[in-house]
Every structure is written in structure tokens, then in C-alpha cells.
């Protein structure tokens, strides 16, 4: 199994295997692994933003990525909230589990798609979603552009 497949499968799994793995690595390996993960997350974010733009081009507002969307996580009970924000110290003596089911298939498909995608042929700069109402620099640029409108 490729190291990136192993890493991404642990990262996307809903357990603490990723943290157990990370706790056993040295700093240089950890930073390298984080860089690999962020490259794939940037690719996924790029796909999501392009998909959102396609939906908006046909008049559908995809709420999850729109500027007006306020809710990041839906909590059905307080236990979900507690699990998300409870920062329990990492135990390194546990076993790392690797899901070789659908999650592993997803990771392999993601890696293949990134490799064969036209998006991946050019170097992907880190993709970030900018909310123009909250980004001061972007808002200032937009104000300058609006004030320089040429009237006919």
C-alpha cells in the first residue's frame, strides 16, 4: 500500500488511528505527512468550489459553501458536540486501525482522480474560499473597483 493511501485512509476514518500514528512519528515525518494531506484537501476544496460555481451558474445557491451559510456542524445531541471539542490527550500505545472498505476505495479513487485530472496537470496553489464580506483586503479592493466605475 502506498504511504499516501495509508495516511489518507487513517485521516478520513472516524476514529483516533490518525492521532495514534502521528504521535509515534518524528517532527519531520509529521510535517511531511501534513503537507501531503493538505495537498489532497486543497484538491477536494478546489473541486467543491468549482462545483458550487456551476450550481450557482444555473441559479441554485449551494448553501453549504455560500456566503450566507452560518452553520458549520449540525449537532443532534450534546454528545456529538462534546466529541468534537473534547481534546483528550493522545494515547500512543493503542493499535492503529486501517479501514480497507469503502473509505479505502474512496482514497484510491481520489488519488487516481487527482493524478489524471486536468486540474492536477498544473501546479495547484493552495485553494482558499474567500468570503468577501469578512476579508478586509478583498473588501477594500472591491470598494476601489466600485469607486472607479466609468459612467457612460
Curated annotation (Swiss-Prot):
It comes from the Viruses. One of its GO terms (cellular component) is virion component. It is found in: Virion; Host cytoplasm. Keywords: Host cytoplasm, Late protein, Virion. Induction: Expressed in the late phase of the viral replicative cycle. InterPro entries: Poxvirus_J1. Belongs to the orthopoxvirus OPG100 family. Late protein which is a part of a large complex required for early virion morphogenesis. This complex participates in the formation of virosomes and the incorporation of virosomal contents into nascent immature virions. Plays a role in DNA packaging during immature virions (IV) formation. Homodimer. Part of a complex composed of the kinase OPG054, OPG092, OPG114, OPG115, OPG142 and OPG157. Interacts with OPG175. This is Virion assembly protein OPG100. It comes from Monkeypox virus.
Amino acid at each position: 500500500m502506498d504511504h499516501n493511501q495509508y495516511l489518507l485512509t487513517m485521516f478520513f476514518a472516524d476514529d483516533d488511528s490518525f492521532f495514534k500514528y502521528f504521535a509515534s512519528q518524528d517532527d519531520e515525518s509529521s510535517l511531511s505527512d501534513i503537507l501531503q494531506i493538505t495537498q489532497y484537501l486543497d484538491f477536494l476544496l478546489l473541486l467543491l468550489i468549482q462545483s458550487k460555481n456551476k450550481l450557482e451558474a444555473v441559479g441554485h445557491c449551494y448553501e453549504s459553501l455560500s456566503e450566507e451559510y452560518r452553520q458549520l456542524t449540525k449537532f443532534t445531541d450534546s454528545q456529538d458536540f462534546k466529541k468534537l471539542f473534547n481534546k483528550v490527550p493522545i494515547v500512543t500505545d493503542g493499535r492503529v486501525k486501517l479501514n480497507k472498505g469503502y473509505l479505502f476505495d474512496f482514497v484510491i479513487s481520489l488519488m487516481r482522480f487527482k493524478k489524471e485530472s486536468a486540474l492536477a496537470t498544473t501546479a495547484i496553489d493552495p485553494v482558499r474560499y474567500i468570503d468577501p464580506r469578512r476579508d478586509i483586503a478583498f473588501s477594500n479592493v472591491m470598494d476601489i473597483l466600485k469607486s472607479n466605475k466609468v459612467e457612460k
